[in-house]
């Protein structure tokens, strides 16, 4: 990616972030006259820039995923701390997001440390504009993913804990457990030397080709369900959060990239073709009989 493309990407990313922050700030609680949602959106990007500088100077990507996770945790705690509505629902949302972020962030951080580098960044980290754009994209990812929860925490609407919150939490818990189990199964599979250059077909991976992504999509829908009763007015716009996660993981990165890579790597492999024909691409379900 050249400098012009990177700069355009950064501009578009920031424009989308500003739009989301502005719309959701229209019905947000304020602190000293500043919308809580908009303030937290600003801090999200400030965190990215603070860590981007030493990362670029040292030409390292080791703190990229970790920074994303820490941003989720920091903003969740900050928003609850600043909100005048200290409710059980807000605390629950912050805990749900923090638990997910701690688990995923540590998993990705140690995976990169073990592998030595993240090959996505080999060239990117040497190009200022491209690397900077990527950190901005991460900021937008955090904002859009966190949007529904942040909108609920920023909402002036007061609601009582009810069955909708319980249902949403159970959806989140189910998705979280699926993601954790799937990641652990694949990590153990890859750790065995005899599985080098092989694809996993056991455990949850026998029912879905991407169970970890299904789990992540499901848990963010759970977060949105918990957040839903607290929303009003323009804050409903933040319900794009789980939709964004779904599109991102199935159309932009995640599933689409890994499917293309797998078809290229195991092209002509009859066992892989059989696995594709038998196994659901995303939603776990019993393998087809062929």
Residue ranges with predicted function:
Residues 1-14:
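N-terminal membrane topogenic signal
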Residues 1-2, 23-32, 52-59:
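Short juxtamembrane and helix-loop transition motifs at transmembrane-helix boundaries
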Residues 3-6, 34-39, 56-64, 206-211:
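Short, amphipathic, aromatic/basic-enriched membrane-interface segments that mark the entry/exit
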Residues 31-46, 61-73:
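Loop-to-helix transition at the N-terminal end of transmembrane alpha-helices
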Residues 49-60, 106-113:
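C-terminal ends of transmembrane helices
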Residues 58-74, 117-134, 198-205:
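Juxtamembrane helix-capping/reentrant segments at transmembrane boundaries
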Residues 109-120, 185, 254-259:
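Juxtamembrane/interfacial segments flanking transmembrane helices
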